[in-house]
Amino acid sequence: MEIVYVYVKKRSEFGKQCNFSDRQAELNIDIMPNPELAEQFVERNPVDTGIQCSISMSEHEANSERFEMETRGVNHVEGGWPKDVNPLELEQTIRFRKKVEKDENYVNAIMQLGSIMEHCIKQNNAIDIYEEYFNDEEAMEVMEEDPSAKTINVFRDPQEIKRAATHLSWHPDGNRKLAVAYSCLDFQRAPVGMSSDSYIWDLENPNKPELALKPSSPLVTLEFNPKDSHVLLGGCYNGQIACWDTRKGSLVAELSTIESSHRDPVYGTIWLQSKTGTECFSASTDGQVMWWDIRKMSEPTEVVILDITKKEQLENALGAISLEFESTLPTKFMVGTEQGIVISCNRKAKTSAEKIVCTFPGHHGPIYALQRNPFYPKNFLTVGDWTARIWSEDSRESSIMWTKYHMAYLTDAAWSPVRPTVFFTTRMDGTLDIWDFMFEQCDPTLSLKVCDEALFCLRVQDNGCLIACGSQLGTTTLLEVSPGLSTLQRNEKNVASSMFERETRREKILEARHREMRLKEKGKAEGRDEEQTDEELAVDLEALVSKAEEEFFDIIFAELKKKEADAIKLTPVPQQPSPEEDQVVEEGEEAAGEEGDEEVEEDLA
């Protein structure tokens, strides 16, 4: 509805009408310049002038359509392995195959299908579809791209008080999720009000975590169960072992008792390859390795004390800060200690002392990373102090390969799961180094500055394309490496094998040479002792007597000097004589001197 209002005013109230006409210009006033005022003029220097140098900005609005996503699942029942058979365990699969091959129905089906398949195979072999018709043409040169990496996503700690990302774990099914453990590792420096939550992130949604895990104490380690992706195992800062089931929510499903847990933070937790998928073990800086079954967390099933003296004394145990277990070697495991020593253990040994097989000393500081090569398990990688080292189980005295000393401390390392000669390291200055010792041994193939703060942990995806790095401020950066770093190269396995064997052989030769030199030095020392004659060993009595006399007189003279000094201290100080007395004393001394001179002359006569 329109509203109209009419203003009314009389014509007489408008005033007289203006009549304008053209005329010539007129000069109304003319002021002549004053020279006296010109002499008083002073230029201002400096001059304050206001300017505006801010960036001009404009506001624009855009309406973009939201990309909606939904999760769908498919349950495939036909085919595959039975539930009681773990496809990752070689022994179980071989046993199941042998059982199926003995079945009569399987044998009859193979016999019936064999004739059909034989006809198809003969057809395939009749013509070589890969035959080259133009051998004379020059092969096209393959352009090798430079190694590179790019940032895919960044997952930031949603809490206001930032914590360090201490451990990462990839989801076993498709690696579409990432579990991150957050904790403050500075002893008794945790800020007031710091949250103890850790999170599971979806790679497609970096804005909000998919699930928050709420432990009783901040988590130092966190691992997905490879058999059941809904179950996670965590090691707490107070030494407890916690277990979660994501189907039940954020709260802890199983928790070990404080009395039977570790006394220090749990720096390593690993799932074991078992039929039930419920067995695991943990390591801590209290010097203990404990085995657990998550169905009964009241006490550990087994405990090993890391006492390299093999006396099983907890006060002499070395603190464990990294843990390694290879499923192909189910009885062996390795522990990296705070003292820079790697301990190789055998779980199936009869006594606790025999469970510690050998040690590998080689670092000046704690060993923050320890991992076997996925292609050659006899060789393993360690990171401690300012270097990364590659070891062989056949050479215990020294490593076979090592990097140069960096300016910043190394914090973590991992092998590439697809290339045997590639490994990754992180540093305290926020740099990620990618090493490929098949092409270059002295320097990293690629160094990438991920962030300004220190990088604490890293984890490589199973296909080797993605790398997750956790920083001191809780920022997890997801990186994608170039195809050259995530694709197996031609003859790379043979090159890596020959390189490991050559370096191991070289270290053995050096160890043997050092052993010979030590034996020679020991023999020379023993020979010098035997060559000493009886005269050299005989006691020189005169020398001993003279030495004893000198020591005796030295003691006597020292005592006399001490007594004289004490007597001087006890003697009273005489008063100062007057000038007259001084004159009398001087005259007496002169007279005494003259008498003495006369006596001397008489004696001479």
Curated annotation (Swiss-Prot):
GO CC field: axonemal dynein complex; axoneme; dynein axonemal particle; external side of plasma membrane; glial cell projection; microtubule; outer dynein arm; sperm flagellum
WD repeats by residue range: 150-203, 208-246, 253-294, 301-347, 355-393, 399-437, 443-481
Compositional bias of kind Acidic residues: 579-605
Region of interest (Disordered), ranges: 568-605
Cellular compartments annotated: Cytoplasm, Cytoskeleton, Cilium axoneme; Dynein axonemal particle
GO MF entry, a single one: dynein heavy chain binding
UniProt record similarity statement: Belongs to the dynein intermediate chain family.
Protein name according to UniProt: Dynein axonemal intermediate chain 2
Source organism of the structure: Homo sapiens
Name of the gene: DNAI2
